[in-house]
Swiss-Prot record:
Gene that encodes the chain: priS
Protein's recorded name: DNA primase small subunit PriS
GO cellular component: DNA-directed RNA polymerase complex; primosome complex
Organism in which the protein naturally occurs: Methanococcus maripaludis (strain C7 / ATCC BAA-1331)
GO biological process per UniProt: DNA replication, synthesis of primer
Family as reported in the entry's similarity comment: Belongs to the eukaryotic-type primase small subunit family.
Length: 363
C-alpha cells in the first residue's frame, strides 16, 4: 500500500464497496439506523482509523443520509447521549447533556479453544460472545429488572461482540414515571453502580443479596460444593471461614470465575459522551454488518455472525488476489479462505483490508 491511500488500488476498491453497500442499505433496504432525535445526537466516523472525526451533527434525516452516501465511512457511530450542542468540541460539560441511552458492550477476546491470532475471529470466540450476552440477560436483566425480550435491543457489532440497549416498553414504570425515562436520566454514578453490581464489584460476602446468592449457589452445586448453609444465611464470609483450606480455596476460585464471566466494556456505561456503532453500518475491521437481532434468534443459536453478518451481495463479487503474508483461515458463509486463496469474494477482501493484511488485487 502506498503512503497516499487515494493512490492505492485496494483502498479505492474498498471505498467503492462501502459506497455500494450504503447505497443499498439506505435506498433499497432502509437498513441504516437514523438515531432518534437526530439534531441532538453526535455523529462520528472513521476511515483508516477507528475514529477520524466526531463532534458532528445533522439537522435533518435527509442531510444525514446524504452525507453517509457521499462519504461512505468504514466506521460510523452515534452518541448514546442526547445533547444541546452535539457538535461543540470540549467534552460533556460544553455539549450540554440532556439524557443518555443505557447500553452494554460485550467485547470478547480469543478463547482457549481459538487457534488463531489475537485479532482474528472464529466460531469459538463468537460463540463465547453469544454466551456472555445470554448470561447478562438471563442472570440479571430479566430476573433483577423485570425486563423481557421486548425491552431489549440486541445488536451484533460486526466483530467479536454485541451491544445490548435497555429500551423498556411504556408499560414499565416506577411509580408514575416510565422506566425508560428514569434510566435515561441516570447520572454517571448511577450507571457505574449498575454495571459494578452486574460485575460483582459490589459483592459483600458478609451481606449477600439474593441474586448473586442464587447465581453462586448454582455454580457451587456444579462444583459439588455443599450449599445448604449458604442457602440459609447472608453472612457467607463467616461460613466460608469454617471450611477446610482446600474447600475455602475452591469457593473463592469459583466466586472469582463467576465474577469474571462477562467481558463488559465499562467505559461504554461510564462515559457521558460515548459513541457506539450505528446499526446497519459495516464494521471497518471486518466488513461484517452491524446488525440488530432478536433474543430468541440468539438463544436458539439461529443467528450465525459468520453467515448472517455477511452482506450477501459481497459474497458474490469475486477478485483475483495475491495474499503476501501467512494468515489464519476464516470461514464466511461456509467458505474457508486463507493466505493460499487466490480467488476471494468482496466479503473476505474487506476483512483482509480491515486487518491490515498485505495483499494485492490482480487484473
Amino acid at each position: 500500500m502506498t503512503d497516499n491511500p487515494a493512490d492505492n488500488k485496494v483502498f479505492n476498491e474498498v471505498s467503492s464497496l462501502y459506497k455500494q453497500y450504503f447505497d443499498y442499505a439506505i435506498n433499497v433496504r432502509k437498513w441504516l439506523e437514523i438515531p432518534d432525535d437526530l439534531p441532538h445526537r453526535e455523529i462520528g466516523y472513521g476511515m483508516l482509523k477507528k475514529v477520524d472525526n466526531r463532534n458532528m451533527s445533522f439537522n435533518t434525516n435527509g442531510e444525514y443520509l446524504a452525507w453517509v452516501l457521499k462519504e461512505s465511512p468504514f466506521h460510523l457511530y452515534k452518541s448514546l447521549s442526547y445533547m444541546e450542542y452535539p457538535d461543540v468540541v470540549g467534552g460533556a460539560a460544553k455539549k450540554g447533556l440532556i439524557k443518555r441511552e443505557v447500553a452494554f458492550d460485550i467485547d470478547t477476546h480469543k478463547t482457549e479453544k481459538c487457534t488463531h491470532d489475537d485479532s482474528w475471529i472464529c466460531e469459538e470466540c463468537l460463540g463465547e460472545a453469544r454466551n456472555q450476552v445470554l448470561i447478562l440477560i438471563e442472570d440479571f436483566l430479566f430476573p433483577d429488572f423485570g425486563l423481557s425480550e421486548k425491552d431489549l435491543k440486541i445488536v451484533f457489532t460486526g466483530n467479536r461482540g454485541y451491544h445490548i440497549y435497555l429500551k423498556p416498553e411504556d408499560t414499565k414504570k416506577i411509580g408514575d414515571t416510565k422506566l425508560l425515562e428514569k434510566i435515561e436520566k441516570w447520572e454517571k454514578n448511577e450507571r457505574r453502580y449498575f454495571i459494578e453490581y452486574i460485575l460483582g464489584k459490589n459483592l459483600n460476602l458478609r451481606n449477600m443479596g439474593s441474586r448473586w446468592k442464587n447465581i453462586l449457589i448454582r455454580e457451587f452445586k456444579k462444583n459439588k460444593i455443599s450449599t445448604k448453609k449458604f442457602e440459609k444465611t447472608s453472612d457467607w464470609k463467616t461460613e466460608i471461614d469454617t471450611r477446610k483450606d482446600n474447600v475455602r480455596r475452591e469457593i473463592y476460585e469459583t466466586i472469582g470465575k463467576v465474577k469474571s464471566r462477562l467481558e463488559l466494556d465499562e467505559k461504554v456505561m461510564d462515559d457521558d459522551i460515548r459513541l457506539l456503532r450505528t446499526i446497519g453500518s459495516l464494521h471497518g475491521y471486518t466488513g461484517l454488518m452491524v446488525k440488530e437481532i432478536t433474543y430468541s434468534s440468539l438463544k436458539s443459536n439461529q443467528f450465525d455472525p459468520l453467515n448472517h453478518g455477511v452482506f450477501s451481495k459481497f459474497h458474490k463479487i469475486m477478485y483475483n488476489v495475491n495474499i503476501k503474508q501467512e494468515i489464519d483461515p476464516l470461514t464466511l458463509k461456509g467458505d474457508t479462505f486463507d493466505h493460499k486463496s487466490t480467488e476471494i469474494p468482496a466479503s473476505y477482501l474487506l476483512f483482509l483490508f480491515g486487518h491490515g493484511i498485505d495483499f494485492e488485487i490482480l487484473e
